[in-house]
A protein has these predicted regions:
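Conserved aromatic
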Residues: 33-36
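Short aromatic-glycine-(Arg/Gly/Cys) micro-motifs in beta-strand/loop hairpins
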Residues: 1-29
Length: 87
């Protein structure tokens, strides 16, 4: 099944996405976040129905892009499963 994602709203450093039936959002704690396109692509790549993601900028690379830490939490199972992915 293919899921389409759209940026629904942007308020400060919080962005919300519509992915199929569920609202999903990520919050960047970086003061200057200029990688919204890359974050959206990563979000689409790792997020499926029943999963929520939370992304946090944990540093900056040599080119000034944020180094992101993703929390992927499964919400439709009996146990929540959480993993972290460095992008």
């Amino acid at each position: 099944m293919r899921i389409s994602y759209y940026i629904e709203s942007t308020r400060g450093d919080e962005r919300r996405f519509w992915g199929g039936r569920k609202w999903r959002r990520y919050i960047s704690q970086a003061k200057h976040y200029n990688a919204a396109g890359d974050a959206l692509r990563a979000h689409k790549a790792i997020c499926e129905v029943g999963y929520q993601t939370n992304v946090v900028a944990v540093g900056m690379d040599r080119d000034g892009w944020p180094i992101m830490s993703w929390d992927v939490i499964k919400v439709n199972g009996l146990l929540e499963q959480q993993t972290k992915i460095k992008l």
